[in-house]
């Protein structure tokens, strides 16, 4: 099916059929083209492909039929023109940003971000003369005030990792483009997936994913994606990846992600249903000081969540009374949940940001980003919700005895 035909289909049909390729053997599953290079018919053909005058494969760092399948699938689901894969989520982030900025440029970013993204923006880019201003993106006016004549990127996570702050994508995109139509609004959509939120439809220019998480969904792949206009994705592919990061997704990993994405919608429905039940339990437990989950009416940005998200996801941030030591006690007391970083797996994962994912932050940076010492991040899995709740209850009860 061509792209126009696919666009008429529902989400579930797209996630199964988008990107599918026919092969001469009639294999139903996507073939794994485990090759580093591709043969040319002639020197002239090789020249045309390197000059981008002819479509076709050259070298797997630049593209591979198996990775093309999953790239086209995600582009279709995000309503983007094109997609570029990378060997990790941070590989997608760096390949994307390096293809845009030069020394002397400026970026506005949310003050609360995934730890490695923050480290790259705050510590890495400064070594190369790129200035980054971090703001609380819950209020679009903060973004507006931070914009400069040399601002090339507005970088957002919504919900933000780990404290679940939301950003009004449509409002920020309008502000950024009014300031400079060439300014790229980049949204990390890892927490939501295209099933729950589509930033391009809301005015953003670029969408990023760590496909390690929900897109793959089974905890056995490291991968990332960049989605946007074809012209920009070509720039990421032939500048950001080819010449700068070399962050290339292997064909076997691409195959696994494509397989995982065929069940994305039903997995996300279950994740979200479980998370709602778990959040409602946590909100009432006496050991919990505060909880951030967009599906709770007590969540400060509940109305924004309803406006730009289909469902509220499966990530929960909650702070336990007693600070750092209480957080450690809770983590060390769970028996059913798995203590691990990452998210979006079938298993429920629990972790302590201050000592794990956000260790690249200094204590002062964590405080400035509203990451409390007792904050716990929970990735609600696909198990029975009652079993997840029972485990959390026995662990939390130890904090109030």
From Swiss-Prot:
GO molecular function: homocysteine desulfhydrase activity; methionine gamma-lyase activity; pyridoxal phosphate binding
Record carries keyword Lyase: yes
Enzyme class (EC, first level): lyase
The keyword Lyase belongs to this UniProt entry's keyword annotation: yes
Protein residues bound to pyridoxal 5'-phosphate: 59-61, 89-90, 210-212
Entry EC number(s): 4.4.1.11, 4.4.1.2
Residues recorded with modification N6-(pyridoxal phosphate)lysine: 213
Annotated SUPFAM superfamilies: PLP-dependent transferases (SSF53383)
A single GO cellular-component term on record: cytoplasm
Residues the entry annotates as binding substrate: 114, 377
UniProt keyword terms in alphabetical order: Lyase, Pyridoxal phosphate
Reactions listed under catalytic activity: L-methionine + H2O = methanethiol + 2-oxobutanoate + NH4(+); L-homocysteine + H2O = 2-oxobutanoate + hydrogen sulfide + NH4(+) + H(+)
Pfam families tied to this protein: Cys_Met_Meta_PP (PF01053)
Cofactor entry: pyridoxal 5'-phosphate
A Gene Ontology biological process term: transsulfuration
Its biological purpose: Catalyzes the alpha,gamma-elimination of L-methionine to produce methanethiol, 2-oxobutanoate and ammonia; methanethiol (methyl mercaptan) is considered to be one of the main causes of the oral malodor associated with periodontitis and may also play a role in the pathogenicity of T.denticola. Also displays homocysteine desulfhydrase activity, degrading homocysteine to produce hydrogen sulfide, 2-oxobutanoate and ammonia.
Family: Belongs to the trans-sulfuration enzymes family. L-methionine gamma-lyase subfamily.
Subunit-level organization: Homotetramer; dimer of active dimers.
Protein name: L-methionine gamma-lyase
Organism: Treponema denticola (strain ATCC 35405 / DSM 14222 / CIP 103919 / JCM 8153 / KCTC 15104)
């Amino acid at each position: 099916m061509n792209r126009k035909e696919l666009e008429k289909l529902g989400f579930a049909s797209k996630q199964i059929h988008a990107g599918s390729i026919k092969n001469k053997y009639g294999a139903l599953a996507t073939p794994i083209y485990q090759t580093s290079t591709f043969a040319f018919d002639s020197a002239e053909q090789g020249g045309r492909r390197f000059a981008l005058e002819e479509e076709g494969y050259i070298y797997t760092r630049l593209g591979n039929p198996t990775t093309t399948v999953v790239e086209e699938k995600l582009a279709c689901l995000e309503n983007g023109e094109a997609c570029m894969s990378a060997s990790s989520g941070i590989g997608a982030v760096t390949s994307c940003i390096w293809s845009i900025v030069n020394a002397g440029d400026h970026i506005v970013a949310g003050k609360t971000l995934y730890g490695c993204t923050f480290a790259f923006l705050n510590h890495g880019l400064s070594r190369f003369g790129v200035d980054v201003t971090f703001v609380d993106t819950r209020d679009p006016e903060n973004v507006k005030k931070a914009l400069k004549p040399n601002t090339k990127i507005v970088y957002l996570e919504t919900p933000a990792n780990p404290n679940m702050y939301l950003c009004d994508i449509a409002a920020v995109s309008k502000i950024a483009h009014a300031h400079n139509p060439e300014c790229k609004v980049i949204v990390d959509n890892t927490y939501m997936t295209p099933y729950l939120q589509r930033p391009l439809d809301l005015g953003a220019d670029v969408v990023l994913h760590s496909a390690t998480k929900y897109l793959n969904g089974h905890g056995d792949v490291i991968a990332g994606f960049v989605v946007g206009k074809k012209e920009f994705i070509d720039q990421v592919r032939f500048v950001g990846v080819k010449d700068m990061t070399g962050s290339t997704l292997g064909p076997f990993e691409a195959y696994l992600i494509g397989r995982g994405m065929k069940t994305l919608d039903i997995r996300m429905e279950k994740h979200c249903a479980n998370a709602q039940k778990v959040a409602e339990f946590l909100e009432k437990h006496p050991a919990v000081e505060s909880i951030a989950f967009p599906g709770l009416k007590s969540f400060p940005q509940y109305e924004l969540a309803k406006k730009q998200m289909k469902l509220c996801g499966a990530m929960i941030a909650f702070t336990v009374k007693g600070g750092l030591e209480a957080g450690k006690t809770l983590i060390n007391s769970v028996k059913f949940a798995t203590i691990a970083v990452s998210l979006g797996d079938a298993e429920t994962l629990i972790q302590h940001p201050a000592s794990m994912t956000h260790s690249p932050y200094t204590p002062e940076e964590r405080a400035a980003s509203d990451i409390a010492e007792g904050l716990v991040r929970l990735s609600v899995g696909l198990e029975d919700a009652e079993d997840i709740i029972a485990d959390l209850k026995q662990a939390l009860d130890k904090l109030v005895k």
